[in-house]
Amino acid sequence: MNALQWSFRAQCLTGFLFCTGLLAYAIFLQLHQGLEPCPLCIFQRIAFAVLGILFLIAGLYNSSNVYTRKAYGLLIFLTAAIGTGIAGRHVWVQLMPHNTISSCGSPLSFLSETMGPFEVFRTVLTGTSDCGNIDWRFLGLSMPMWSMFWFVALALLGLLVGFKAERRKPLFS
């Protein structure tokens, strides 16, 4: 069965299931494998959660209005683009030599208690050497590289579900 021909609802719920699976695997690695997430990892998880919620709402609402579907597709694409940017920054921090990145910063909980939300976001995006550690690889790619791959794939899925031309029923059948 061709997934490109699935209904709007099926494609959105598939996107939701992918986001849920990615988050579940990240939590599994944290709780059972002992991989503690850095602040950039947490922001990527938040982006996957928001993506999953958008896919779920779009799939459950299942609007037949073309403009509503385009709005969902655009929101999903923009959220995935933000996630891609965060993951890209994380990959860049990992690929930089460790002595060029500032020393380990404070934990995210401490930052959120002492700073405003925008300052926390700016501080986290500067990256710490903690974010530069590569603790996990699969097929030669680190976790942020895989996150970036999935953000791009989900962005393309968002564009597909939002801007896919609907088949018109024949006038005479």
Curated annotation (Swiss-Prot):
Question: Sorted alphabetically, which Pfam families does this protein's record hold?
Answer: DsbB (PF02600)
Q: Could you list this entry's UniProt keywords, alphabetically sorted.
A: Cell inner membrane, Cell membrane, Chaperone, Disulfide bond, Electron transport, Membrane, Oxidoreductase, Redox-active center, Transmembrane, Transmembrane helix, Transport
Q: Does the keyword Cell inner membrane apply?
A: yes
Which cysteines are cross-linked by disulfides? 38-41, 104-131
Periplasmic side, ranges: 29-46, 89-145
The protein's topology relative to the membrane is: Multi-pass membrane protein
Q: What GO CC terms are in its UniProt record?
A: plasma membrane
Q: Which InterPro entries match?
A: DiS_bond_form_DsbB/BdbC, Disulphide_bond_form_DsbB, DsbB, DsbB-like_sf
Q: Does the keyword Electron transport apply?
A: yes
What Gene Ontology molecular-function terms does this entry list? Answer: electron transfer activity; protein-disulfide reductase activity
GO biological process terms, alphabetically, are:
protein folding
Cytoplasmic compartment residues: 1-11, 64-70, 165-173
Task: Please list every transmembrane segment annotated in the UniProt record, as residue ranges.
Answer: 12-28, 47-63, 71-88, 146-164
Domain of life where this protein originates? Bacteria
Q: Where in the cell is it found?
A: Cell inner membrane
What does the UniProt record say this protein does? Required for disulfide bond formation in some periplasmic proteins. Acts by oxidizing the DsbA protein.
Question: Member of which family?
Answer: Belongs to the DsbB family.
What is the recorded name of this protein?
A: Disulfide bond formation protein B
Name the species this protein comes from.
Xylella fastidiosa (strain 9a5c)
Question: Its gene?
Answer: dsbB
